[in-house]
Every structure is written in C-alpha cells, then in structure tokens.
Amino acid sequence: MPLTTKSTRLSAQDWLQRIRELDLPEKVRILNVCGGHERTITQAGLRTALPANIELIPGPGCPVCICPEQDIFDAIQLALNEDIILVVFGDMLRVPVNVPKREIRSLEQAKAAGADIRPIASPMEAVNIAMSHADKTIVFFAAGFETTMAPVAAMLAAGAPDNLKVLLSGRLTWPAVAMLLKSGEASGESFCKPKFDALVAPGHVATIMGPEEWQFVVDDYALPTAVAGFSPESLLAAFYSILRQKIEGNVFLDNCYAEVVKPGGNLVAQKTLSAVMDVSHAHWRGIGSIPDSGFQLSEQYAAFDARHFFSWENDSQRKHAGDMPPGCDCTRVILGNLYPNQCRLYGNACTPRSPIGPCMVSDEGACRIWWSGGLRQIDSKTLTSNSLDSKTMA
C-alpha cells in the first residue's frame, strides 16, 4: 500500500528528516525522466541535502533535447518560405543543428535572416494566428511529450483552420525508459546502460496518461517507482517511498502526486489523442529509433500534416541530418551516463549564451538547469571514466 498518503501535509524538512532516519545498507541510484523534476532537485539543492548514499540521476526528460535534427531542418526550410508563418514553442528557437558556420543553424538564426517565426505558449495561439492570416500557410512546429501532444490533439479535434499545418515531433516517455531497462540498445546503436535502482515518474505525464503507465517498471524489473509532482515536498515524498520500498523489499508503484494524478489519468485527453494521433516508431536525437515512441497524425487528420503537404526530397541538408555535434556529450547526459558538468564542452565551448548541444538550450535540459542553478564547476576528474559512480556536485 502507498507509504506517502497525505504527503503534502509534511514540509520538505520533515521529509528530509524521515529520509535521514532510514537505514540504507547501500547506495541507491534514483533516475528522473522529467526536466521539471531536475529543475526542482537542482534549484532546491536536494542532492546536497540528501544523505551521500542517495544518488539522483537526470534522465531523458527533455523533449527539445531529443527532437531530431531532421525535424529542425524541416522547420528551418519551411520558415524561410515567404508564404509561410512558422509558429513554435519558444524553447525550440535556439536549438542548434550541425551545419557549416556560414549556414543557418537554428530557428533563431532563420528569424534573424528574415523568416516569419513566432514563438507561442499554447496551441490555440497557432489557431488565432492562422485565422488572422488567411492568406498565409501557418506551420505549427510542435515538439513535446504526452503533456504537449494532448492539447495539440484537442486543437485539431476542435476544428482547426485549413491554412494551419502541423509539423509534429511528439514522443512518448515510457518507451525510452523501457528501452533503457530492456537492453541498452536503440535501432542497433548500443550505449552504456545507466545504473539506476529506482524511478521517479513524471507527474504531468501521469496526469494525462495515468500512473499505471509506469507499472511495467515494477512488474517487469522489480524497481521501486513513484510518481511525483514538482515541489520539493512531492519529490522528497517520492524518494522516501522509493527508499522504504528498497529497504523493506516491497516494491510497488506509489502515487505521491495524488492531489493531481488520478487513477486512469485523463480519459477525455487519452481518447482525443487516440483519435487524432497514431503511435509509431520514432527517432530520438542521439539515441536512435525507439519502437512505438512517437506520435504522428492519423489518416483522418492527414490534411493538417505538414509532411504530407510539403516536400523536402531535394534538400541535401535534411538528408544528411545527424545527431549531436562533435565533442558534445548530450546523449550521455540524456541517458543518465554522465552528469552535465562531466560533458567535455560544459562551461567551455558550451554555455547558455552560446550553446553547442540541445541540453544547454532548453529550460528542461539538464545542462541548462545545472548552469542556471549555479553548478558551473567542471568535473574533470571523471571525464575519463564517463560514469556516475560518485557524487560530482560542485
């Protein structure tokens, strides 16, 4: 049964005290797969507040970071068409792609070159822009996880203007974790599996899809798992539950965000997602193709699909789209193999002002979160081992 009922009634200090009183016989590595969780962990200083034998590992929780270069190339090319207005969530503007220095390497640079690119905060803004510019084609470059895809689906289901097209780059979160746990391989590309003993599942995704989406981590891999919200109190409650499960040998899925996350999730949103979008194999930047991890518009909504409406067959850049820039360790950071300050470029060539890799661009990227949180000391001692065997907090 859940260990953290009425968790919101305890303060962060109360939860820390409870955790410190636990008798942990060995180190416990806890993976998070949400940029919001990593931001709270870093800003609240939870790594240094917790006992030394509890390790918190940032994982694949940033949709901007894993958005394929090919999709960004497509968005740039469309934006440079004078008959098109491209709308996009703001954190995609500065994501760089691999091109020669003299060529456009981000949507921000395309905008500076004259492209009509407009940052938006919600899908309904895309609808409003399309309605007020009937003489233009509006392309909505929509990248994100389930929480973002649900309102995109709702926008289309409600009836979008004919001049609105969607360049979709949506992903599901759980298949990435399943891939990590299963084999450490994606589309034939092998990598070092992260070492983790438990999982903190993202509360916002569970709000839409239901906490049950993460039951497989318990059933198939016997790992303690807890859904958490975004306050220090909710995360600490999840850590406490996970640690108790580990100590007592009683593994289950706990919901430490019960005030928001309900059993079964949001059934209306799920029904709309299923009607508007299909699930397919999808490429994750730096990782490879993960089965059943991507969203694409269903046949019923194909008229809104930018990929059906436009053609890129003769675009050489698109055909040669790669993954991470040379020297960039974003893939290892995303997969939980490295802390951000163990990347070879962190704080040297790569900073928020001049980012090289996508993890330094997005507000949900671990590198950007660490830098903004003041964790700027480079951990040069571990660059040769590329492991998370010890705490490397600056």
Predicted regions and their residues:
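Short beta-strand segments
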Residues: V33, P58, V87-G90, F140-A143, ...
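Active-site histidine-anchored catalytic micro-motif
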Residues: S132-A142, T147-P202, I208
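Short amphipathic alpha-helical segments
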Residues: Q43-A44, V152-A154, E212-E213, Y240
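A conserved active-site cap/scaffold subdomain adjacent to cofactor or substrate pockets
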Residues: L167, S190-K262
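Internal helical hairpin/lid segments
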Residues: L236-R332
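Metallocofactor- and cofactor-centric catalytic cores in central/energy metabolism, strongly enriched
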Residues: P2-D135, M149, P161, P175-V177, ...
